[in-house]
Amino acid sequence: MSSTPRPAELPPEKSAHRSVSLTRDALGHYTVTNARGGTMTLGDDADFTPVELLLAGIAGCSAIDVDYFTSRRAEPLEFVADVEAEKIADEQGNRLTDLVLTFRVAFPEGEGGDAARAVLPDIVKRSHDRLCTVSRTIEVGTPVTAVVESAPTGPDSIA
């Protein structure tokens, strides 16, 4: 059980702890593991960088919202979500500005496709304004607390 406080505005069934663990594989190369056992690598070669993962999180989070709502009406012929941003360094430090999420979605002709096209703008807006946890966290902002835990040292400390 986590001691992390839950946001007051969420009922307990809507508040859930999320976590990943990053392990260093080599200088500039890391493996991230989620609680379900999924893994991915990140680093400075062909792997995703942390900034690219943030952008992928924005695209993925909103795309899931949009896909679930529109695919109930028609299976898309094309479904692409692109995210772009400018990385800057200023008096506030390194950060991204001017984030833009663009959806390119095509549906078949016919009643289902027409229905999906009709709800698409509203679903994109709802995802942006309320549903996508990733982009909402960025837009609303939340503190990030960095903690250093003591790690065992010496040759006998590694199992």
Regions found by a protein language model. Name each.
Residues 1-56, 64-159:
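Extended beta-strand/beta-hairpin segments
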